[in-house]
Amino acid sequence: NLLTSKTVNVTLKYDPATQKTRDGSFDNGIVVHEYGHGISNRNTGNGSSCLSSSVSKEQMGEGWSDFFALMLTNQPGATAGVPRGIGTYATSELITDGGIRPAKYSPDLAINGYGYGDTNGMEYTNTAGALVPDVHSIGFVWATMLWDLHWKYVEKYGYSSDVSANATNGSTRVLQNVMNGLKLQPCNPTFIDGRDAILAAEAANTLSNGADKCMIWNVFAARGLGVDASAGSKTDINDQTYSYDIPAECVLATNDVNAAKAFSIYPNPAKNEFFLKSNKSILGKVSVEIFDASGKLVSSQKTAATEAVNTQALPNGVYVVKATGLGVDYSSKLMIKK
């Protein structure tokens, strides 16, 4: 063995001209990220202990912090086509390099193809021998979705690197809705809870009043956080179920299935019942399904085409009615107003 029989001389050299040792305290993204933990912790639940990875293994705190870092270090003229990394200064990389996350942040699935299903198994054994969730990787998936959402808002409302410039550009709108979502979500939320809180925040936002709901659904669903996605048990990071489905109402808006006005429902708004109306004869019974605004099936009935559809049990709100039968395949919005 060389080490036991010979003397080994080792020379360590430090050349300031070629070796860079950077302090993360000078990395704007890292500084914003760490302050971001205070924002997400203070605004969720009781404001102190509601983002615990030991209670909910889908703890997304690292994701909100990355999102805040990305948003507050946006450059003038930036586009969705420029991928972003986190911690690139501290690692002596370019701002377009990967940084310290599994992939660069980008809505391009060829660059960042991570989705909700990938959170399954994101755990590791720590130095104490305990199996714990990999909160940075889990948060990275959440931030990926939020970053996608930012660029969709930008497509619709425009971009601003200065989120304090005005309240109407897409960058400011999405940041405000994400911030408001923190205040609406329950203690120790899952991805599902976080998604629903952002949807609720958008519905309550007087600038849009729910007009961007389907845009939000499409973004989350594209990464596997669709209508039928399930978080499973909060204490298990291996039982999440992904879904690419969007609410029936959003499918309706996309496909415009009633373009020819071949089908309608009346009265609309309705109180305790409504009727189907078609410009052609309908044979046999029709299956009528009613979905609420979140895409949840709240009523399923089979009725003759001329019979009333009962809505007594439905509270006021906007619904989607889907009617199927022999030669029938229609969808329509319905408002219940009692």
Language model segments and positions:
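A generic alpha-helix propensity feature with a strong bias for hydrophobic helices
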Residues: 105, 110, 250, 270-272, ...
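Low-complexity, Pro/Thr/Ser/Gly/Ala-rich linker/spacer regions in secreted
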Residues: 245-261
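Intrinsically disordered, low-complexity boundary segments flanking structured domains
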Residues: 164-165, 252-253, 296
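Extracellular protease catalytic domains of secreted zymogens
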Residues: 1-247
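C-terminal outer-membrane/trafficking sorting elements
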Residues: 256-338
